[in-house]
């Protein structure tokens, strides 16, 4: 569990500081001076079940994964006892309004919500010591959690079937 928190913390810090803006500009700049930069895998939402099957089978470095299309819409697919739930961490101030949107979404769909933190320091606001996390305790199989993730990305973040997401971590 501590490894999961540390990994999510480092990931959130990296995404919050640099943004998961899907432009590739930073990587291109570093590559132009001879620094090799690994690129995150990119998918559309229809490929998410395959990624989650790999997570569930233990074929990934961590027992969770996330998708991030524009730096604000990052959701994490967490695993517990073979079932998945979704976390959202508000690392930047532009993510804060989505906490209430996700709570409302969870209420409308009768998903239990847990408010927590990974003890990560927000990147551009100081009124909270740690970045808040909303955990939607869906406890679903892969097909069901993909539907929930797709609903969140489309209704809350206004993404669509063609949105390209980076897989994180």
Label every PLM stretch briefly:
Residues 1-7:
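Bacterial N-terminal signal peptides that target proteins for export
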Residues 24-169:
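Structured alpha/beta or helical-core interaction and ligand-binding surfaces enriched in interleaved
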């Amino acid at each position: 569990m501590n490894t999961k928190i540390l990994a999510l913390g480092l990931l959130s810090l990296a995404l919050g500081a640099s943004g998961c803006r899907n432009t590739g500009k930073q990587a291109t700049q570093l590559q132009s001076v001879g620094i090799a930069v690994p690129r995150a895998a990119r998918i559309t939402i229809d490929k998410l079940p395959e990624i989650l099957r790999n997570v569930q089978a233990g074929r990934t470095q961590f027992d969770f994964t996330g998708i991030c299309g524009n730096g604000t819409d990052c959701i994490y697919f967490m695993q517990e006892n073979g079932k998945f739930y979704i976390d959202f961490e508000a690392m930047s101030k532009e993510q804060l309004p989505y906490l209430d949107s996700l709570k409302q979404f969870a209420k409308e769909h009768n998903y239990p919500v847990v408010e927590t933190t990974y003890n990560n320091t927000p990147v551009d606001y100081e009124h909270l010591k740690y970045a808040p996390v909303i955990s939607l305790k869906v406890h679903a199989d892969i097909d069901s959690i993909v539907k929930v993730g797709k609903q969140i990305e489309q209704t809350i973040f206004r993404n669509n079937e063609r949105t390209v997401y980076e897989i994180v971590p």
